[in-house]
Curated annotation (Swiss-Prot):
Subunit details: Associates with the 50S ribosomal subunit.
Binding site for GTP 2: 187-194, 234-238, 299-302
TM segment ranges: none
Record's protein name: GTPase Der
Role noted for this protein: GTPase that plays an essential role in the late steps of ribosome biogenesis.
């Protein structure tokens, strides 16, 4: 599980700047969901080998009772509930403001671990920066500059330590949570996730457990299908009632991110009776960004006429082009149709994500691809692609060595990706291609 850090403060104290600084390794913004654009943004970051989730909130004015500011305050309160640690940001240049006192009063009542960060402190002495803010009763302030990065790593390091103190299970490895292929079923509310869970587990013996803590902790459901062990990771807020799991359908970005990170394969479930939404596309973006193997299930397919089915397939091709590496299955979780093929694709996607690719074959495919179509020249030189080897798995990473590779176009990179996918039958997994330019040993020599 990844620690969750919420950034809270009044307007214009630098929360978004700090958010972007913290999440730079993952291109900052991971989620910007409809209805949340003025309040909560979610991103993934990493300090060394420790990943975390950051939540950027809108300007917080807890005493306002109506209007858009009140709605922003509501969303900020939700971020605090989701967080393991709250970083309360104030403005060192402007000093202590009445809104800061109101926010501090609110945060004290929540019982959350809170760190006080005095932003915009570059060029200022710590004693003068911190003096105003001790009266908030939030402990020793951390002087930082989100814009320049000063003090940010130390701040996040301490936040992660506090998170582990709050929830010791955060320090544990996720690898032991569940047997077999770990599957996360994700999607917006009411697409049929709980029905699919019940269909998959059938009458098999189920071991379900709640990890200690709050609603943002996961449920793992172990089951067998065709003699193979699997573990389902809940993202829908499933709770067991008798032998049936029912969904408390409230979409949680944090739970979705956590479950995707913990999974081997993700099933993205869509509703055939509703148009593809921005939220569907955002969830798909989470999965691609994470590098997880993917199978797409289009649920509630039963009862649709041929014209409607053709229209839906056209919309899927148009709106989810970036998921072309995945298998799409048209299923009915309620009627239990198409589930066998869906699970076969889960197995295939897992195998593709974990595949071992020998260097000689990788290099041969590269040479054949270049022979068929060379990369375009960039100025006076043409990129020279020499050899390839595997740089990692889950997702597979292919590292290509050569000269002048910085000028290889995105179009040519996609061409190579397609050649490798076809050669090794890599269906269902993202594929990363990295270019490494060899140093020219004669670059510094003179004629």
């Amino acid at each position: 599980m990844k620690p969750v850090i919420a950034l809270v403060g009044r307007p214009n104290v630098g929360k978004s700047t700090l958010f972007n600084r913290m999440t730079r390794s993952r291109d900052a913004l991971v989620a910007d969901l409809p209805g949340l654009t003025r309040d909560r943004h979610y991103g993934e970051g990493r300090i060394g080998d420790r990943p975390f989730i950051a939540i950027d909130t809108g300007g917080f004015e807890p005493v306002v009772k109506e209007g858009i500011v009140a709605e922003m305050a509501k969303q900020t309160r939700q971020a605090v509930v989701e967080a393991d640690v709250v970083i309360f940001i104030v403005d060192g240049r402007l000093g202590l403001a009445p809104q800061d006192r109101a926010i501090a009063d609110y945060l004290r009542k929540t019982g959350r671990r809170v760190m006080l960060a005095v932003n915009k402190a570059e060029g200022m002495k710590y004693t003068s920066v911190a003096a105003d803010f001790y009266e908030l009763g939030m402990g020793d302030p951390y002087a930082i500059s989100a814009a320049h990065g000063d003090g940010v790593r130390e701040l996040v390091d301490e936040a992660l330590e506090l998170a582990v103190q709050e929830r010791p299970e955060l320090a544990e490895e996720d690898a032991d949570s569940g047997k077999g292929v770990k599957i996360a079923i994700v999607g917006r509310p009411n697409v049929g996730k709980s029905t699919l869970v019940n269909t998959l587990i059938g009458e098999e013996r189920v071991i379900a457990f709640d990890m200690p803590g709050t609603t943002r902790d996961a449920i793992y459901v172990e089951f067998e299908r065709g003699g193979k062990p699997y573990t389902l990771i809940d993202t829908a807020g499933l709770r067991r009632r008798g032998k049936v799991f029912e969904a408390i359908e409230k979409f949680s970005v944090v739970k979705t991110l956590q479950s995707i990170a913990d999974a081997n394969v993700v099933i993205l479930l869509l509703d055939a009776q509703q148009d593809i939404s921005d939220q569907d596309a955002h969830i798909a973006g989470f999965i691609v960004e994470s590098g997880r193997a993917l199978v797409v299930g289009v649920n509630k397919w039963d009862g649709l006429d041929g014209h409607t089915r053709d229209r839906i397939k056209h919309d899927l091709e148009r709106k989810l082009q970036f998921l072309s590496f995945a298998n799409f299955h048209f299923v009915s979780a309620r009627e239990r149709t198409g589930i066998g093929a869906l699970m076969r694709s889960v197995d295939d996607a897992y195998a593709a994500a974990m595949v071992k690719l020998p260097t000689p074959q990788l290099t041969r495919v590269l040479q054949e691809a270049v022979e068929f179509q060379q990369p375009k020249r960039a100025g006076v030189s043409r990129p020279k692609l020499r050899y390839a080897h595997q740089g990692g798995s889950n997702p597979p990473i292919i590292v290509i060595h050569g000269n002048a590779l910085s000028s290889v176009s995105e179009t040519y990179r996609r061409y190579l990706e397609n050649r490798y996918r076809a050669a090794f039958k890599l269906k269902g997994t993202p594929l990363r291609i990295e270019f490494r330019t060899n140093k020219n040993p004669y670059a510094d020599s003179k004629d």
